[in-house]
Swiss-Prot record:
Pfam families: PRK. GO terms for biological process: CTP salvage; UMP salvage. It comes from Bacillus cytotoxicus (strain DSM 22905 / CIP 110041 / 391-98 / NVH 391-98). HAMAP family: Uridine_kinase. CDD domains: UMPK (cd02023). This is Uridine kinase. Its EC number is 2.7.1.48. One of its GO terms (molecular function) is uridine kinase activity.
Amino acid sequence: MGTNKPVVIGIAGGSGSGKTSVTKAIFDHFQGHSILILEQDYYYKDQSHLPMEERLKTNYDHPLAFDNDLLIEHLHQLLAYKMIEKPVYDYTLHTRSEEVIPVEPKDVIILEGILVLEDPRLCELMDIKLFVDTDADLRILRRMQRDIKERGRTMDSVIEQYVNVVRPMHNQFIEPSKKFADIIIPEGGQNHVAIDIMVTKIATILEEKVNL
């Protein structure tokens, strides 16, 4: 482990923008190094105190759906090179699972999620802030493909959710958070030039921290 605090990279962007592809590309490049991925999706609020009919109304694209207090606490622990117990969210029960995942601290932390740039407290902890910017038509097509294939959703339900929830929340919260990004990556995981530049920048920051 390094003697300096870890490097934190925030990667935000709308659903289906290619955040995960960008995250994986960066992670794969540093494979074998001390690096971890922390997904904001794991930090939805515990709703075990609510009846199921209330849980079903959860808007997962709204900032208030996330337990950022716990996420920030865990980030501070990782920055101090302390282990955390990452929560697990059960989407079938619409609440937090009793299961936790032990996460060892690493020298590079990739924080990925639709709204990681929306909370100034999270932004303050980041060394590099990225926003993956992809055309809305492509994002809905990717989301449709994912939800139908992986989550057993119907096309009608995906479209209805997109029109009533995903698009309004994107326009209200996700898109405005783009202004806090240091770097905007168009075309998501297909933008190999931008990813290569990011990899070089991260390597430079790591080298600077080692030489301090």
